[in-house]
């Protein structure tokens, strides 16, 4: 109920923002009709605001076309100096998933029930030297958020499960997936068709915002 009220408020703000955008577009003689701009912005914002983490899935395989679409969405993410330091390991066949499950005694049964794993990894050979060599964390995080949003847009559920920077997990996953030394797993995104409806959380908090520079 509270989230519904929150979404109504969000919609009111979006309408106001779109009105301002329509005015700006008109000034700039935009080639796109305002109705297209408004519909597109509404769909994008609705997708962002209604996404939530899903951990329980139907035993239904995900179509290859959707898997490729998820990976394409990930690779469309922003990247420092266009390094594109990402590499993906995809587990979609039951044999591979069961191999992965066998390496994790605490979550083996849940792993077996997950239709798709996308491990987002960093290829350290594509990064620079000095402080810049750690920028892969930001790049691969942007990749991961794109995948989460794309999954939601396609009617799939997904959840980011952390690997890096927990070294024990990094080492264990690297051994299980037989990753070469230049690949570092950031996370495993678990994906499937949701087994139950989940209501997104309202995370809005004005106290976490500072406008301007204090005197």
Residues of each region from the PLM?
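Bacterial N-terminal signal peptides that target proteins for export
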Residues: 3-14
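Acidic, surface-exposed loops and disordered segments
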Residues: 6-8, 25-215
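Bacterial N-terminal signal peptides
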Residues: 15-22
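Intrinsic structural disorder/low-complexity segments
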Residues: 14-15, 189
């Amino acid at each position: 109920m509270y989230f519904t009220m929150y979404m109504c408020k969000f919609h009111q703000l979006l309408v106001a923002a779109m009105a301002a955008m329509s005015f700006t577009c008109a000034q700039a003689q935009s080639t796109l009709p305002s109705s297209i701009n408004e519909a597109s912005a509404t769909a994008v914002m609705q997708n962002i605001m209604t996404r939530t983490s899903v951990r329980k899935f139907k035993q239904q395989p995900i179509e290859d076309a959707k898997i490729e679409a998820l990976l394409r969405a990930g690779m469309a993410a922003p990247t420092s100096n266009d390094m594109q330091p990402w590499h993906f390991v995809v587990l979609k066949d039951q044999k591979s998933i069961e191999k992965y499950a066998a390496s994790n005694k605490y979550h083996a049964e849940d792993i077996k029930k997950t239709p798709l794993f996308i491990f987002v990894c960093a290829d350290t050979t594509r990064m620079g030297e000095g402080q810049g060599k750690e920028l892969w964390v930001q790049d691969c995080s942007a990749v991961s958020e794109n995948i989460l949003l794309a999954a939601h847009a396609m009617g799939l559920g997904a959840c980011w499960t952390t690997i890096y920077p927990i070294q024990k997990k990094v080492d264990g996953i690297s051994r299980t997936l037989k990753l070469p030394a230049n690949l570092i797993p950031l996370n495993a995104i678990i994906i499937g068709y949701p087994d139950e409806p989940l209501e997104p959380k309202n995370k809005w908090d004005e106290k976490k915002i500072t406008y301007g520079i204090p005197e």
